[in-house]
Amino acid sequence: MEIPKTERGSGLFIQPVHFDHIVSSGSTLLDLAVSGSRASEGGIPAGIVMEIFGQASSGKTAILSSIAAQAQSKGGSVLFADPEGRLDKEYARIYGMNIKAENYAQPDFVTDLLKMIWEFKSSENSTDVFIADSIAALSTKMEMDSDEGDKMGGKKAKDLHQLMRKTCRKIAKSNLLVAFSNQLHDSMSAYGSRTRTPGGHAIPFYASLRLEIKVIRMIEEELSVDRAILGSIRETVVLTGSDKKSAAKKISKITGVEAVVRIVKSTVDDPFRTAPVRILFGYGIDDVGANLQWLKTVAGLSKYLAVDKEFIRYQSAINYIEEMNYEKKLREQVSYVWHGIEHDFRERSLRKPKQFL
């Protein structure tokens, strides 16, 4: 597929400029939002610190687990630091992440996390990932040893500054991606944002990539429960005439969430892009579903475009893509349209070379 090109001044701005080491998030649209102007398929480059933050149950661990699984699928090493101590191995397997004793740890303090990053031995030919989920759960020795604790959070903020300063220097020229998750807390200040991420300003300052994830709606499915599926229970119940003729009961269930990821800071590519992400319980990131919906919305179509066919029903389009193994072709289609949109925006904003005063 040909990637759009644009001219800037007297030089030629050619997309993309490929990174040496890059890992996918598992979401085509999120990959493109992160670095679509720098790499044809986008993705998260190694050698940086990234942070993803959001409310509880918004999908932070899902995104991090997917990143880890993508890295492992390409032969990369992963170390999952779990200060919260609640990562379930079966949950990790849903996303394809393989968690064993040697690549899982439960650090207590910020200093423990720094030591783990420095002792992590990154390979030469693959993209490796170090994950900490979440920073908010880390403590300091002052907090644990003192009766009063670290009330103002000053010691934790200081330790995080040291952690980030040393970490950024270590990984700057490596093939290691350091990814943190963080929570959103209510801000006690009467000014500015009503929410904040705990730990001070260290991570927002040093992180090259910050992602905010928000759930926009629950994915709800409805099922008609036919009396026939009651099996042997039905044989023990005496049904009246009206019961026999009554319609099947409809039961609804929340099966996932639709979220939007917003890039609030990026030194990788253009910031403030957004990407829709679908997360299905028991399945993981639904890239096919998100891509189909995005194409339909962006192109203003009345039907779902499934590579070479159109479908009225959403599930029929998904089934066709999976049966024909068209997942890659669908990703390429989405990438082509996305690059076309970016090309048009860049063409519109072209300016003559800047004059120095």
Language model: regions and residue ranges:
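N-terminal cationic and glycine-rich segments that engage phosphates or anionic surfaces
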Residues: 143, 186-190, 307
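Short amphipathic alpha-helices and their capping/turn segments at secondary-structure boundaries
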Residues: 113-130, 167
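The Walker A/P-loop phosphate-binding site
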Residues: 1-102, 118-122
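Flexible beta-alpha connector loops of hexameric P-loop NTPases
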Residues: 100-109, 143-159, 191-195
